[in-house]
Amino acid sequence: MSIGNIVQCIGAVVDIEFPRNAMPKVYDALVLEDSSETSFAEKGLTFEVQQQLGDGVVRTIALGSSDGLRRGMAVKNTEAPISVPVGQGTLGRIMDVLGRPIDEAGPIASDERRAIHQKAPKFDELSPSTDLLETGIKVIDLICPFAKGGKVGLFGGAGVGKTVNMMELINNIAKQHSGLSVFAGVGERTREGNDFYHEMKDSNVLDKVAMVFGQMNEPPGNRLRVALSGLTMAEKFRDEGRDILFFVDNIYRYTLAGTEVSALLGRMPSAVGYQPTLAEEMGKLQERITSTKTGSITSIQAVYVPADDLTDPSPATTFLHLDSTLVLSRDIAALGIYPAVDPLDSTSRQMDPQVVGQEHYNVARAVQQTLQRYKELRDIIAILGMDELSPEDKMAVNRARKIQRFLSQPFHVAEVFTGSPGKYVPLKETIRGFKMLVDGECDHLPEQAFYMVGSIDEAFEKAKKLQ
């Protein structure tokens, strides 16, 4: 194994010089040698080679804090890419980007390790799926149903409920699905990771979840690679013939970490200051999150939308790869309707009568038409008031307001904050409830009866109490 020396250190980007005949390959992992002069630096600090500059010099990203580094320090080439433990031993454990345990529960009992850089499955190995995955959340099951082995994006600005929605999905699917899950925390709050761990522990599903975290306080190198570490663990389970759930919170921070180091690596920035390799980096990650003939990966990804602008290059690049897009709206959150999913902006490739069935399709489209009509009439109502509307329009507005409220639902994971018990609504109940609403069978009920209830029967009971 060849030894090199640090020649330049700018933030997270470090240049290291090796003998010309022993230059490391791109993506090789390099490790800081232990010596008296490295006492102030992070012990066993790992670097990943990004570029070969020539004359034996390579440009690397530090996967850890570069505090305490200085020129001349010795670095060893491991002659292999970064690898993480995979298999049964990772379940119930919390790991960092390098697969080291951070839950103080001893070493990880796994003999096998896999490199985090893998090729995407070949075209002939892929297996598309049309089986629906029931989530128990009305607005999702009705408007943008998920497919087993599909990819879902939760799009939303700051504070509209991406993480809470994801927690509820994990809570509902991981418990109902009783399969294995991998959670990758990419550049999010450490508190949320802690909450997630305890949530899983209290629900007794911790032994079915592997967790990898590279949170907000960590250097960009960790945040850039932690999604790949989590994905590598999920791929191992898929290749064993299992159906896996892969959660990523938040995919935008993965892009952002790439942006942070891109300029330091000497690349010209592209639109809005993003790295020029944005589409390639996203494609490399997303193409690996797929289902093969041996097993499936169903992935649910939270996507932060900067300044609520869906045309920003980062969310726009993510859109291309998804089967279902769940758009969270600040306007709906402002009305106090949670989950704040926008039923007119959210889409799903599964919303096809041949996949979901004719009745489901008709009800979902009728709900969207009613809400769209209400949206169009809103300006007229604001200027002239309700009295100027035709009887048909008045009826459409009243139904739309009831539908809007019926799309809200109390969550299990929010019980602590709201005090109202969470509700899981089966798909059949969801379709029945909205069918009654659009058919006018609930026109006599007050709209307050539909707010924060589970099934339509609960709305009828609530209406009796309100009278």
From Swiss-Prot:
Gene3D superfamilies: 2.40.10.170, Bovine Mitochondrial F1-atpase, Atp Synthase Beta Chain, Chain D, domain 3 (1.10.1140.10), P-loop containing nucleotide triphosphate hydrolases (3.40.50.300)
SUPFAM superfamilies: C-terminal domain of alpha and beta subunits of F1 ATP synthase, N-terminal domain of alpha and beta subunits of F1 ATP synthase, P-loop containing nucleoside triphosphate hydrolases
EC numbers, comma separated: 7.1.2.2
PROSITE patterns: ATPASE_ALPHA_BETA
Membrane topology label: Peripheral membrane protein
Transmembrane segments: none
Keywords: ATP synthesis, ATP-binding, Cell inner membrane, Cell membrane, CF(1), Hydrogen ion transport, Ion transport, Membrane, Nucleotide-binding, Translocase, Transport
GO CC, any one term: plasma membrane
UniProt-annotated binding residues for ATP: G156, G157, A158, G159, V160, G161, K162, T163
Catalysed conversion reaction: ATP + H2O + 4 H(+)(in) = ADP + phosphate + 5 H(+)(out)
InterPro entries: AAA+_ATPase, ATP-synt_VA_C, ATP_synth_F1_bsu, ATPase_a/bsu_AS, ATPase_alpha/beta_chains, ATPase_F1/V1/A1_a/bsu_N, ATPase_F1/V1/A1_a/bsu_N_sf, ATPase_F1/V1/A1_a/bsu_nucl-bd
Subcellular location: Cell inner membrane
GO MF term set: ATP binding; ATP hydrolysis activity; proton-transporting ATP synthase activity, rotational mechanism
Domain of life: Bacteria
Annotated function: Produces ATP from ADP in the presence of a proton gradient across the membrane. The catalytic sites are hosted primarily by the beta subunits.
Record family assignment: Belongs to the ATPase alpha/beta chains family.
Complex and partners: F-type ATPases have 2 components, CF(1) - the catalytic core - and CF(0) - the membrane proton channel. CF(1) has five subunits: alpha(3), beta(3), gamma(1), delta(1), epsilon(1). CF(0) has three main subunits: a(1), b(2) and c(9-12). The alpha and beta chains form an alternating ring which encloses part of the gamma chain. CF(1) is attached to CF(0) by a central stalk formed by the gamma and epsilon chains, while a peripheral stalk is formed by the delta and b chains.
Name the UniProt record assigns to this protein: ATP synthase subunit beta
